[in-house]
Amino acid sequence: YFSNPLCIFGPDEPVPYPSASDQLDYELELAAIIGREGTNIAEKDALSYIAGFTIFNDWSCRDLQRDEMQARLGPAKGKDFATSLGPIVVTPDELEAWRETDPPRGSRWRLRMQARVNGKTLSDNNASTMYWTFGELIAHASRNTRLQIGDVIGSGTVGFGCLLEFPDGTHPWLQPGDVVELEIQPIGVLSTRVVGASGQEGP
């Protein structure tokens, strides 16, 4: 799906709690940033279009998303209110030591991925487990359309990289005042505080 490029938040930038939702969730993803324009990019050539990698928090309103997905259409209000990126962009050559080849599907990166809420670790997995490779994702995203410089391609949420994947009641939905930290080394930590819709923190 396509997200909203007008609602991008950087590292340490607070994210307002969406007023229409009661079920705010984080999503822990690795993101590739496109560095060359291209259309109908072949999987075998796709990595040459990546300028760098960063951490991607694909915030989601699960109650809105659940209602909207019944129509199987998009983009949707459960996804278009915020995307957090950062803290830095790491170039592909800087991650070469973590790259592993998965023929014939392309490359994956052995990067530990963790998520913490208010200092408690809730998610701990690895980017090497991502289902689709970035080669496959870029080839699909560029089919019959043009990828632009600066476009961001998310890996999809790593296993147990969001509250939705835990059994009901195990971990409550996010609230104003919560601090979400997503960590992928050697990229760093993307820290975000959730604030009230008007910018105030919760109790």
Where are each of the predicted segments found?
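Conserved S/T- and glycine-rich ATP-binding loop of Class I adenylate-forming
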Residues: 32, 150, 184
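Charged, cofactor-coupling segments
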Residues: 68, 77, 83, 87-90, ...
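Generic structural signal for buried aliphatic residues
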Residues: 30, 153-154, 180
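A conserved acidic, glycine/proline-rich C-terminal tail/linker
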Residues: 133-175
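Glycine-enriched loop-and-adjacent helix/strand subsegments that border the catalytic/binding cleft
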Residues: 1-138, 144, 199-202
